[in-house]
Amino acid sequence: IIMTADRFIDGIQLLHIGPKTDKEYAAELEKEQLSLIHNIGEHYNYDVKHAKQVERLALAMFDKLSKSHGMDEHCRTLVQATALLHDIGKYISMRSHSLYTYKLIMSTDILGFSDNDKKIVALASYYHANQLFENKAGSPEMEKELTPLVAKIAALVRLADAMDRSYQQKIKFCKVSIKDGTMLIEAKS
């Protein structure tokens, strides 16, 4: 039997401090998170090709807009998770898929995601298909301080989802640029 000298608290510290101090560790943790997110999607029978297309398009827009909107690498991870998981609620209900997506994400542990991160991904997944300030019965509650980030992520995923509405991945090339304060999307199929 081999016993390590590490305590539980050492593991928790490594989980939270490691990514900030060690780039190799951060890359490995991100790889593990992405693998887990794909496993969650597969568990709920998501459309892999559509999810990856929405991810690709949303991240292309994020990469161009992030600096001007004050969004960092961690926000990029949240956009990526939202893009990949935005439709998992269809496993339960096609009609109310966004609500079930919210509930499934909230009830799932995602390595390296705080409860707040999970809530942001769940809310952005919900609002990718619903009006942000629509006060429908059964809508999840959102804290005021989360609204700006959730709105930005939901908008990116909503637009990326609309660009693959056919679920056929017709857009092969997507270039995003900013001109005179306007976002231009050049897409080729």
Model region roles, listed by residue range:
Residues 181-188:
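Short, aliphatic-rich beta-strand segments
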Residues 29-32, 111, 186:
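Short, surface-exposed, polar/charged, turn-prone segments marking secondary-structure boundaries
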Residues 38-41, 50, 56-177:
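Divalent metal-dependent catalytic cores for phosphoryl transfer on phosphate-bearing substrates
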Residues 16, 83, 187:
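Flexible glycine-/small-residue-rich
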Residues 4-36, 51-52, 58-59, 118-131:
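Glycine-rich phosphate-binding/hydrolytic loop that grips phosphoryl groups
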Residues 5-7, 74, 178-180:
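Short Gly/Ser/Thr- and Asp/Glu-enriched loop/turn motifs at secondary-structure junctions
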